[in-house]
Amino acid sequence: MSYEEVQTLLQMINVDLSEQYARSLFQKCDRSADSRLDHEEIEIFCRELLRRPELDTVFLRYSANDCVLSTVDLRDFLKDQGEDASLLHAQSLILTYELNEWAQKNQFMTPNGFTMYMLSKENCVLNPEHARVYQDMTHPLAHYFISSSHNTYLTKDQLTGDSSIEPYIRALNHGCRCVELDCWDGDKGEPVIYHGHTLTSKIPFVNVIEVIKEYAFKASPYPLILSLENHCSVEQQTVMAQQLRSILGDKLLTKPLGGLDPHSLPSPEDLKGKILVKGKKEHGAVEGSSSTSELSSSDEEASRTSKKGDQKPSVSKLSPELSELVVYTCSVSFKSFEHAARNPATELSSFSESDATRHIKDSGMYFVRHNSHQLSRIYPSGQRLQSSNYNPQEMWNAGCQIVALNFQTPGEQMDLNQGRFLQNGQCGYTLKPPFMCQPGTTFNPENVGGGPGHRPVLFTVRIISAQQLPKPEWDKPSSIVDPQVWVEIHGAPIDNNKKKTPHIDNNGFNPQWDCTFNFTVHAPDLALVRFMVEDHDYTSSNDFLGQYTLPFTSLRTGYRHVRLLKVDGSTLSPASLFVHITVGPCESSPSKSSTKSPARSPTKSSAKGP
């Protein structure tokens, strides 16, 4: 490769080196002095380019002889990381990541082996214990946040977009545990699914149920809820019931579980492998129920997004065959928290985002209490015709379980949803904090200055560097990104906060910041942390490059790599951030974060920070 060809290569991988440094590095690696790099020289050039001086600095802080890490040196590092600091674990890491035979034989780790280890999944910022199902799955359903999709069949907007089975497959493969089916009378007696009174296309109900049968439990063994928005005639409701029974077979829950109170909610563990129907139930079908066959909140949702002047009377009669498939998730109109408290836990109310927000502002504590007993479903405003999303965190703060989002619309709100359900094996159920599950809780999401859920901690995050950031897809091939990093806290209102690093000019390959932020997190059990990288632009809005969101309680302290994700939530490998994290007791409770340097020491012990 000539020098000009090397420059083209650097541009392709988003590296903008100064002319002086690029030529100096080229000449250093051109050992044959023929103004070209052969295969071996290209390898040396890339190795020099890929050097991680910030990792070398960490390595040297722990190396007793500045050459290698002994098992004792590595043990000290692991201790400061808050990990298993046994010599046996240190030895196993050397055997796994050290490629130099002499070093491995003598139980040493070289800088290259250390880099391999630091870049491995073993050093991810997400607690590996939380990557599996680790929570108690035997609580009632109301004690869990449940990953939920709104108008699952839509591929785009709410008025003209196509309906398809593909969004069901994607949602189920991502661990979604509540999908929505808007059911209407179709031709030849076959019910269809589409967004009623709009120009969205129609798909047969039977096709969706067949897809659900195939994909329901591929990503999670825990119960799947079918949220039926029923606008069908009694005759086609009966067809729906027959198709549900014949296709889903014994996966479909058709009666209360034996040995359990039929008026209490079972647990995800009790309902493993079962599909539940959420819908209205015939009046009096469940003793003590306040359910009626009148228009429910869910039906109101459909009317709010329908084309004006194209309304039809809502269905007021229910098919007994379909009604009897509704067991633990009976849709009812919400009257008041006091009224709901007297009714069975198997009743479920749907709230528009605006109604839910009003209840949170006016009666936050009572909404949390309600959600310790019954399920609540939240759906987007009918004004969101382009399928935009509301902030799900506000609803989780009140303990709402079924917070339905438009999965087809990527963005910050879906990042938060993916982050919320990243833990617990991505099974679609995460256990709510204990203070949200007590019937008499005094937790109020609008005020966590004290009382339940208030256990402030100091979160210190040091953004050290990034690696191999992509260019925005629409950028010119010759452009180089100017990255900056946001660190965001999403949680109780008192905790919502974000800070950004300065931008680095013309370096998406290995930008260095070494910038430290302090945050006080008052309700850590509710908080999410979002790392977001964007391309700074002086003349227009900044372009999104990548992000990663996870529960605050799933963070690992120490030096970690944050593996960035694309806007659609898929992997952006090898793009990552290199960070240092500490979480410690909070001596004071400032409501805003501060920025300073250098970083605090890790909480587990005193670290040798660079």
Region spans (language model):
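Long, acidic (Asp/Glu-rich), low-complexity accessory segments flanking structured domains
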Residues: M1-Y21, A33-C178, W184-Q401, L405-E473
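Short Trp-Ser/Thr-centered turn/loop motifs at beta-strand boundaries
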Residues: D495-N507
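C2-type phospholipid-binding modules
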Residues: V234, Q242-I247, M414, H522-L528, ...
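Exposed aromatic-hydrophobic patches
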Residues: P511-H522, L550
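Hydrophobic beta-strand segments
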Residues: V6, L74, V461, P483-V487, ...
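Short coil-to-beta strand junction motifs in C2/discoidin
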Residues: K471-Q484
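Short proline/glycine- and polar residue-rich coil/turn motifs
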Residues: I504-P511, F552-L555
